[in-house]
Amino acid sequence: MVVTAYPKSSAGMGVTVLPEYLKQSSYEAYSRPYSAFFLSGCTKQERSPLLARRLVDAWLSFHSILMINEEVSDWEQLSDHYTRRSLFKTIAFRNLQREEEYRPGG
C-alpha cells in the first residue's frame, strides 16, 4: 500500500490529509485496523471521530513516507520502533516539516 500524501496546513495539528481521489469506501477499508491501534493508546477524553480520522490520515501519510524512505518495511517493524504516543508526535513533527518545505518562499 502506497498512499501519496499532500501537505495542507489547513488540516490542523500538522496532520496531512488524504488525497480526494480516495473514495470513502477505500478510506474505511484502509482505516479500520489502524484506528483501533491508535485509539487504544488514547485517553477517554481524546477519543472522537475527528481525532480518529486525523490519526488514521496521519498514519497513512507517515507510512507512505517511511515506505518511500525504506526506513520501515512493514507494520511489525513500525510497532517495534515507536510507541503509540511518540509515533503520533513524530507524525505531526514530520508533517509540519514537510509543510515548511512546500510553503511558497520558504
Curated annotation (Swiss-Prot):
One of its GO terms (cellular component) is mitochondrion. Keywords: Mitochondrion. It comes from the Eukaryota. It is found in: Mitochondrion. Its main location: mitochondrion. A stretch of 270 kb of the mitochondrial genome is duplicated within the centromere of chromosome 2 resulting in the duplication of the gene. The expression of the duplicated gene is not demonstrated. This is Uncharacterized mitochondrial protein AtMg00450.
